[in-house]
């Protein structure tokens, strides 16, 4: 029967196997044939040899002949011999010197699947076998049946669920081979290395997202300094384009000043000066009476008029007894013979800190004829003649010169407005006041 089928099951010089051995050989499947996912892992009859896949042909199949028994190549013998041995031994090949790991024989399978066997090759290979630069490692090696590089050579139970990327699963597949035989597989695969560009891109992102980035920037001292300078620049631009915005931007803080006048020329000048020195300040104006002549004459009269304005507001209860106040009073003085000058007196009084300071504006020359007219318009029996004149110099100039205001005639004679004069003196007064204040209140 064996000879008619053309298969030499026993090489020359070896005793014929017993019937029990044949039965065991037929019942024991070939482990190398099972390792290939393309071949059926069992044999239904000893009349056929285990075929090799058509896509992989590194091993010569047994010589098919109907003549007398002939010599079978050692590669075929060594391939078939391991399943017949009671204990598995390392499989060697005469065509390759690569060592293979040992595999334990799987349990016998049913023979009903033998109908799925592929047609054996039509003839033996013409030439020998050798490795070359174009040799595909997935086509099997070392004389054993080819197997998938990512599959073990034993039939594993079906895996349920979704399989992951085969590259990431190569460690679990290679572990049973190494642990079962004590040696790793000769088929190796390159490890998947992480792209450094992706890592750099991920590590460069802030841990806290957008808010974390904003928080980190806001806590930077240099950024804070830049923001402060930017805020000051914006405020300067706004106040330059619209000077009326200054009171709204710089109004606030702990400093509260009351000016003893409701005229904008005085209140605005003092507000700008104190906000320039202190940064922020609340400056308001209240109308007050000086209880002296409308046009004071001499320094003493000027000081008296400024102080009387503050006292009148305190007596009437318009301001608190401890409220800091600034008062402005203008007067004329004959500094040289027949040479008169208009001067402004500024006083700041702070009862809480016991501060009382005075300052004077620059002297603005007044033509002698205007002073003489003001004297002539003042009655001799005027009850406040001791402090000054009934008619101010500004009123006289307004009557004699067209398009000139009685409250701001200084710009015509000097080119500098009265507001500018009060501002410069008030700034000096605010600087002195700041120096006299305790450090904690500055």
From Swiss-Prot:
Keyword Cytoplasm: yes
Region called Disordered, residue ranges: 1-47, 87-134, 171-204
One Pfam assignment: NTPase_I-T
Keyword Cytoplasm attributed: yes
Biased composition (Polar residues): 171-188
Molecular function, one GO term: protein kinase A regulatory subunit binding
GO annotation, biological process: epithelial structure maintenance
Localization, UniProt: Golgi apparatus; Cytoplasm
GO cellular component, one term: Golgi apparatus
Record field: compositional bias (Low complexity): 19-47, 90-99, 110-120
Keywords: Cytoplasm, Golgi apparatus
Subunit structure, interactors included: Interacts with PRKAR1A; resulting in PKA activation.
Function: May act as a regulator of the protein kinase A (PKA) during embryonic development.
The family this protein is said to belong to: Belongs to the PRRC1 family.
Protein name as it appears in the record: Protein PRRC1
Organism (species): Gallus gallus (Chicken)
């Amino acid at each position: 029967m064996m000879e008619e089928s053309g298969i030499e099951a026993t090489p020359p010089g070896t005793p014929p196997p017993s019937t029990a051995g044949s039965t065991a050989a037929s019942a024991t499947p070939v482990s190398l044939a099972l390792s290939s996912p393309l071949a059926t892992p069992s044999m239904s009859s000893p009349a056929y040899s285990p075929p090799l896949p058509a896509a992989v042909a590194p091993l010569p199949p047994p010589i098919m002949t109907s003549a007398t028994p002939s010599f079978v190549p050692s590669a075929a013998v060594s391939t078939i011999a391991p399943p017949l041995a009671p204990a598995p031994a390392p499989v060697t090949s005469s065509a390759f010197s690569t060592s293979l790991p040992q595999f334990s024989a799987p349990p016998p399978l049913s023979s009903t699947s033998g109908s799925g066997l592929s047609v054996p090759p039509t003839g033996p290979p013409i030439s020998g076998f050798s490795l070359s630069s174009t040799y595909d490692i997935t086509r099997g090696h070392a004389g054993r049946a080819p197997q998938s590089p990512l599959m073990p050579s034993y039939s594993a139970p079906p895996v349920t669920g979704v399989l992951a990327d085969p590259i990431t699963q190569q460690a679990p597949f290679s572990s049973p081979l190494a642990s079962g035989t004590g040696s790793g597989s000769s088929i190796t695969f390159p490890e998947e290395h992480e792209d450094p560009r992706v890592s750099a891109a991920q590590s460069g992102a802030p841990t806290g997202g957008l808010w974390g980035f904003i928080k980190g920037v806001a806590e930077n001292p240099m950024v804070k300094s830049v923001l402060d300078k930017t805020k000051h620049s914006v405020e300067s631009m706004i106040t330059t384009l619209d000077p009326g915005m200054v009171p709204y931007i710089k109004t606030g803080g702990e400093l509260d000043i009351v000016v003893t006048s409701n005229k904008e020329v005085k209140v605005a000048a003092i507000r700008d000066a104190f906000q320039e020195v202190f940064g922020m300040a609340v400056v308001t104006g209240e109308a007050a009476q000086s209880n002296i002549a409308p046009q004071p004459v001499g320094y003493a009269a000027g000081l008296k008029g400024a102080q009387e304005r503050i006292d009148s507001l305190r007596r009437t209860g318009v301001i608190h007894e401890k409220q800091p106040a600034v008062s402005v009073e203008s007067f004329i003085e004959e500094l040289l013979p027949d040479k008169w000058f208009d001067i402004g007196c500024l006083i700041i009084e702070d009862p809480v800190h016991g501060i009382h300071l005075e300052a004077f504006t620059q002297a603005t020359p007044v033509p002698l004829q205007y002073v003489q007219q003001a004297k002539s318009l003042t009655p001799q029996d005027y009850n406040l003649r001791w402090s000054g004149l009934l008619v101010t110099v500004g009123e006289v100039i307004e009557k004699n010169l067209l398009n000139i205001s009685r409250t701001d005639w200084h710009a015509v004679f000097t080119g500098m407005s009265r507001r500018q004069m009060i501002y410069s003196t008030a700034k000096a007064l605010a600087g002195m006041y700041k120096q006299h204040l305790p450090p904690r209140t500055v």
